[in-house]
């Protein structure tokens, strides 16, 4: 069984629960309102029921035998990068991650998001479906995007409806709007329809 450790990273406008290994590699990240820690932990625990090969421990209560000094440095470095990313200090911050959830199609969609949607860009479910050779599968693509378990790092927030409106987001459309406003800057108003 592999041990993972979770901690919260507070941004100026929202909170992220990050689960990572002793090398600082992220396996899970969920976003939530600033006062939603308990519900975020509950959701994470529910999600990890589907991955019994992992044991997720609170970083604050982790035994010193599980996290040594070298690991502490790596974990702290990744959490600081996450803080920089969600506070919009470094929109291009590269954070190591490993996908442990998802079907082959979901992983294909997530790879597309990571590789084809850089900071400052957006796409629609329909355009992604067309690009992946599935032109009549916008809804399936939407389900794949919504199944992402590594918020912000895998940029599911950069996918909007064909109408230009912000559509569903596992962590709430207000958080999606906040992230997009900060990533797009002055382009937000001309790109997103309310």
From Swiss-Prot:
GO terms for biological process, alphabetical: DNA repair; methylation
GO molecular function, one term: DNA binding
Other facts noted in the record for this chain: This enzyme catalyzes only one turnover and therefore is not strictly catalytic. According to one definition, an enzyme is a biocatalyst that acts repeatedly and over many reaction cycles.
Biological role stated in the UniProt entry: Involved in the cellular defense against the biological effects of O6-methylguanine (O6-MeG) and O4-methylthymine (O4-MeT) in DNA. Repairs the methylated nucleobase in DNA by stoichiometrically transferring the methyl group to a cysteine residue in the enzyme. This is a suicide reaction: the enzyme is irreversibly inactivated.
Family, similarity comment: Belongs to the MGMT family.
Keyword tags: DNA damage, DNA repair, DNA-binding, Methyltransferase, Nucleus, Transferase
Gene Ontology cellular component list: nucleus
Catalytic site: 156
Annotated InterPro entries: MethylDNA_cys_MeTrfase_AS, MethylDNA_cys_MeTrfase_DNA-bd, MethylDNA_cys_MeTrfase_DNAb, WH-like_DNA-bd_sf
The protein's name in its UniProt record: Methylated-DNA--protein-cysteine methyltransferase
EC number: 2.1.1.63
Pfam families the UniProt entry points to: DNA_binding_1
Compartment(s) where it occurs, according to its Swiss-Prot or TrEMBL record: Nucleus
Reaction(s) catalysed by this chain's protein: a 6-O-methyl-2'-deoxyguanosine in DNA + L-cysteinyl-[protein] = S-methyl-L-cysteinyl-[protein] + a 2'-deoxyguanosine in DNA; a 4-O-methyl-thymidine in DNA + L-cysteinyl-[protein] = a thymidine in DNA + S-methyl-L-cysteinyl-[protein]
UniProt: DNA binding residues: 125, 139, 162
Enzymatic class: transferase
NCBIfam families, sorted: ogt
PANTHER family for this protein: METHYLATED-DNA--PROTEIN-CYSTEINE METHYLTRANSFERASE
């Amino acid at each position: 069984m592999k041990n993972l450790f979770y901690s919260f990273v507070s941004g100026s406008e929202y909170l992220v629960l990050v689960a990572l290994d002793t090398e600082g590699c992220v396996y899970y990240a969920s976003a939530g309102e600033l006062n939603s820690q308990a519900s975020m932990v509950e959701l994470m625990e529910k999600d990890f029921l589907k991955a019994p090969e992992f044991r997720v421990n609170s970083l604050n209560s982790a035994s010193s035998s599980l996290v040594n000094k070298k690991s502490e440095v790596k974990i702290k470095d990744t959490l600081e990068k996450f803080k920089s990313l969600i506070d919009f200090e470094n929109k291009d911050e590269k954070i190591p991650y490993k996908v442990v959830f998802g079907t082959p199609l979901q992983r294909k969609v997530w790879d597309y998001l990571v590789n084809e949607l850089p900071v400052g860009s957006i796409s629609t479910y329909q355009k992604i479906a067309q690009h992946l050779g599935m032109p009549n599968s916008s809804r399936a693509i939407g389900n794949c995007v919504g199944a992402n378990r590594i918020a912000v790092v895998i940029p599911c927030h950069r996918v909007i409806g064909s109408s230009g409106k912000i559509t569903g987001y596992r962590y709430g459309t207000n958080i999606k709007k906040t992230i997009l406003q900060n990533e797009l800057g002055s382009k937000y108003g001309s790109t997103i329809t309310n």
